[in-house]
Curated annotation (Swiss-Prot):
Family affiliation: Belongs to the universal ribosomal protein uS4 family.
InterPro entries: Ribosomal_uS4, Ribosomal_uS4_bac-type, Ribosomal_uS4_CS, Ribosomal_uS4_N, S4_RNA-bd, S4_RNA-bd_sf
Pfam families in the record: Ribosomal_S4, S4
Disulfide bonds: none
Annotated protein name in UniProt: Small ribosomal subunit protein uS4
Residues covered by the S4 RNA-binding domain: 97-157
Lineage: Bacteria, Pseudomonadati, Pseudomonadota, Betaproteobacteria, Burkholderiales
Molecular function as annotated in GO: rRNA binding; structural constituent of ribosome
Record's GO cellular component terms: small ribosomal subunit
Function: One of the primary rRNA binding proteins, it binds directly to 16S rRNA where it nucleates assembly of the body of the 30S subunit.
Length: 207
């Protein structure tokens, strides 16, 4: 399946929650009414969604949130299932360790999509080496930085200023002057308040 390129607010309305696809410069709630699905008849209540439908919708929501397509998402689940511990928590840990997500969490990109673009345009280094693969898994202790020639880009400066106002997660440490940060660890499940029910995804793939 090709990556969705349409209006981001429409995806958040479809899932009924903020997928953080839009910059926090303007709350997506200003543009998207989460209690209304996209389309002319969005408010019309339909039949009760089946368990399978709920599971499928949750998977779609998380895929869209992290910008991951089905084949790769399935591989993340299989890797999470092989690890010790809770499969759902392992899945989220892998997603949070993606380089594009870490760049976003550090505040170098205002959205994951913008962070992914920075990675693909070779504006990001890991431990001093250029990495242009968005799915690259960052390890605890890795130093992620914006390359010198990209540090003055207005979008990066603005994103970092905004991130400092909103708050940078505890599992990354950022040096705003150097425009670099350290990935301290993958976050524990209770450290980020994303509206995700990962158990539904586990149930779906365990059918």
């Amino acid at each position: 399946m090709a990556r969705y390129l349409g209006p981001k607010a429409k995806l958040s309305r479809r899932e009924g929650t903020d997928l953080f696809l839009k910059s926090a410069r303007r709350s997506i709630a200003d543009k998207a009414k989460f209690d209304s699905k996209p389309g002319q008849h969005g408010r019309t209540s339909g039949a009760r969604t089946s368990d399978f439908g709920l599971q499928l919708r949750e998977k779609q929501k998380v895929k869209r949130m992290y910008g991951v397509l089905e084949k790769q998402f399935r591989r993340y689940f299989e890797a999470a299932d092989r690890r010790k511990g809770n499969t759902g928590a392992n899945l989220l840990s892998l997603l949070e360790s993606r380089l594009d997500n870490v760049v976003y969490r550090m505040g170098f990109g205002s959205t994951r999509a913008e962070a992914r673009q920075l990675v693909s345009h070779k504006a990001i280094t890991v431990n001093g080496q250029s990495v242009n693969i968005a799915s690259y898994l960052v390890k605890p202790g890795d130093v992620v930085a914006v390359r010198e020639k990209s540090k003055k880009q207005a979008r990066i400066v603005e994103a970092l200023q905004l991130a400092q106002q909103v708050g940078i997660p505890a599992w990354v440490e950022v040096n705003a002057d150097k425009v670099e940060g350290t990935f301290k660890k993958a976050p524990d499940r209770d450290e980020f308040g994303a509206d995700i029910n990962e158990s539904l995804i586990v149930e779906l793939y365990s059918r």
